Amino acid sequence: MSSLSKEAELVHEALLARGLETPLRKQELDAETRKTRIQEHMTQVMQLLNLDLSDDSLADTPRRIAKMYVDEIFSGLDYENFPKITLIENKMKVDEMVTVRDITLTSTCEHHFVTIDGKATVAYIPKDSVIGLSKINRIVQFFAQRPQVQERLTQQILLALQTLLGTNNVAVSIDAVHYCVKARGIRDATSATTTTSLGGLFKSSQNTRQEFLRAVRHNG
C-alpha cells in the first residue's frame, strides 16, 4: 500500500487492528482487468437467466455493471480512493460538539448485493484539530461504497474519524432502509434500521450522549 496516502494507511491499519475492516483479499488485478473479468462473468450470469444479450437494451449491460461495480458502488474497496483529508489546527480552541446531519448514503448489502439507502449523523468534539466539514461526508461515502453490513459501516466511520482527529470523542448514527428486507424475503416496505456507535464522552457522559441523540432525532 505504498501508493496510498498516509491518512488512508492509518485508517486501514486501525480497522485491521480492531477487526473492523471489510473482509478483503490482496488486490492482484488492476481496475481495467477487474472490469473485463466482471463483464465476462456477468455475461454468463445473464445468459443463465435466459436473457437474450443480442437485444440492444441488454447488449451493453454486462459492461455497464462491471464499470459500476469497480468505479462507483464498490470504489470504497480500494484505499487509493480514500478522500484527501484536510485537518486544520484548532486555534479557536473549539471544545463543543460539531455535528453534521442528514448525510445521504447509498450502500450495498453484502449478503444479497441489493441497496442500503439511508442517512448518517456524525458528531465530534475537537481536540487539537478540526476537519473540513465536507470531508466527513466523503468519509461516510467512502465506506458506504462497499458491500456492507450497517453495524460495521457505522463503526468504520467512527474509528476512521477517531484515528484522523486524534480523539475518542466521536459519535455516528445511521438510519437506513435495507432492500434485502424491502424488496425480497419478508418484503417489509416500511421498516428501517438504526445503528449507533459512540466513543469517548459520547459514551461516558450522559449529557453529551443525549445532546447527540437529540440531533439524531431531528434528522429527516
UniProtKB/Swiss-Prot annotation:
Annotated positions binding Zn(2+): 109, 112, 180
Catalytic activity: GTP + H2O = 7,8-dihydroneopterin 3'-triphosphate + formate + H(+)
Coiled-coil intervals, chain numbering: none
This protein's pathway: Cofactor biosynthesis; 7,8-dihydroneopterin triphosphate biosynthesis; 7,8-dihydroneopterin triphosphate from GTP: step 1/1
Domain of life: Bacteria
Listed SUPFAM superfamilies: Tetrahydrobiopterin biosynthesis enzymes-like
Xref: Gene3D superfamilies: 1.10.286.10, 3.30.1130.10
Keywords: GTP-binding, Hydrolase, Metal-binding, Nucleotide-binding, One-carbon metabolism, Zinc
GO CC terms in record: cytoplasm
Signal peptide as annotated in the record: none
Enzyme class: hydrolase
Any one GO molecular function term: zinc ion binding
Family: Belongs to the GTP cyclohydrolase I family.
HAMAP family (alphabetical): FolE
SUBUNIT field: Toroid-shaped homodecamer, composed of two pentamers of five dimers.
NCBIfam families: folE, PRK09347.1-1, PRK09347.1-2, PRK09347.1-3
Protein name: GTP cyclohydrolase 1
Native source species: Yersinia enterocolitica serotype O:8 / biotype 1B (strain NCTC 13174 / 8081)
